[in-house]
């Protein structure tokens, strides 16, 4: 519960004891037969690239995408290029390790990242913590593969169709799956109108991009619908694709796995199931996210090492422009929806 003041905690959780750091102390057993202590609700830890951008709702960097609390930690100096190559200078590697340790100290139940290329550091991260580490939505791939017949296709959507090729050996090593097997259909979104904003680090106009992503998904599924190898599932590799997951599910009637479902599945394994068994062994989340802005929870020295801090004003300007554009009246375009694309 780090980041919440004592009064808020005492109001929402009467009787709970809180230490000086604002964290819950385990409550004593209700009686002599009680074996379980009440603990905090599970929360998620997210390692961030040193890259400030305006995340859309559904993006892993938007705390509103989750039904549990999220703690973010940016790694100063860790750029997208380093992440893509899977190489960090020793100084930045230590900052990455320190970031994992910091999230661990917040009591998170699992740790992920805001870029699929963090799969390059999956092995390093899991040696630093005993919490489950799922740096990419591709961590779900073994379960998805297991769920469907060998002759059925699985579509893998990425920001760029070429991006998975250099990661082939890594994915085989970490996931036990070869992305170049014939059962996988690799679909790049680099030509989707408006989605180039992802590569530019700008705010994506989700409403404008939505019908194009849906159309791409429907066309991809339709291409194999009447064959002996239909597409049975879709996995979004890019962390900025989940905002479109629900629309694609509705349009294709197929399961869509993404970075959010990856986080949900791991955290659900540490959540109370109220339907049966022992109940109320962890406290309920009050629905308020821990406040976070880019660079928060870093020391002054580390903040000075951020390479993308100057991007913040550009982000703010883009947000203001988007808000202004949305206020302009739009010409009538018919009654179609994203699902009709």
Swiss-Prot record:
Its EC number is 4.4.1.3. One of its GO terms (molecular function) is dimethylpropiothetin dethiomethylase activity. Residues 1-10, 319-328 have a biased composition (Basic and acidic residues). Keywords: Lyase. Disulfide bonds: none annotated. The keyword Lyase applies. It catalyses: S,S-dimethyl-beta-propiothetin = acrylate + dimethyl sulfide + H(+). Residues 1-24, 319-341 are annotated as: Disordered. Mediates cleavage of dimethylsulfoniopropionate (DMSP) into dimethyl sulfide (DMS) and acrylate. DMS is the principal form by which sulfur is transported from oceans to the atmosphere and is a key component of the ocean sulfur cycle. Belongs to the aspartate/glutamate racemases family. ALMA1 subfamily. Homotetramer. This is Dimethylsulfoniopropionate lyase 7. It comes from Emiliania huxleyi (strain CCMP1516). The gene is ALMA7.
């Amino acid at each position: 519960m780090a980041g919440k003041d004592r009064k808020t905690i005492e109001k929402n959780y009467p009787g709970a004891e809180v230490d000086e750091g604002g964290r819950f102390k385990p409550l004593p057993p209700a009686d002599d037969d009680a074996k379980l202590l009440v603990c905090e609700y599970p929360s998620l830890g997210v390692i961030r690239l040193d890259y400030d951008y305006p995340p859309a709702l559904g993006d892993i960097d938007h705390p509103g995408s989750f039904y549990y609390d999220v703690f973010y930690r940016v790694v100063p100096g860790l750029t997208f290029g380093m992440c893509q190559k899977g190489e960090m200078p020793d100084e930045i590697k230590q900052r990455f390790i320190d970031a994992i340790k910091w999230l661990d100290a917040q009591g998170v139940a699992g740790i992920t990242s805001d870029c699929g290329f963090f799969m390059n550091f999956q092995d390093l991260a899991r040696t630093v913590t005993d919490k489950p580490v799922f740096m990419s939505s591709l961590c779900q791939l073994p379960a998805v593969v297991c769920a469907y017949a060998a002759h059925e296709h699985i579509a893998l959507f990425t920001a760029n169709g070429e991006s998975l090729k250099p990661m082939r050996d890594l994915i085989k090593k970490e996931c036990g799956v070869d992305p170049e097997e014939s059962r996988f259909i690799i679909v790049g979104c680099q030509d989707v109108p408006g989605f180039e904003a992802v590569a530019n680090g700008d705010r994506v106009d989700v409403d404008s991009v939505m019908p194009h992503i849906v159309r791409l998904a429907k066309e991809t599924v339709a291409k194999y619908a009447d064959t002996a190898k239909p597409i049975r599932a879709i996995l979004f590799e890019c962390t900025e694709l989940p905002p479109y997951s629900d629309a694609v599910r509705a349009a294709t009637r197929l399961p869509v796995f993404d970075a959010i479902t990856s986080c949900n599945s791991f955290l659900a394994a540490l959540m109370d199931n109220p339907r049966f068994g022992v109940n109320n062994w962890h406290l309920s989340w009050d629905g308020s996210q821990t406040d976070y802005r880019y660079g928060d929870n870093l020391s002054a020295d580390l903040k000075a090492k951020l390479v993308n801090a100057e991007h913040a004003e550009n982000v703010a300007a883009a947000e203001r422009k988007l808000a202004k554009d949305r206020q302009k009246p739009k010409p009538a375009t018919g009654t179609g929806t994203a699902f009709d694309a």
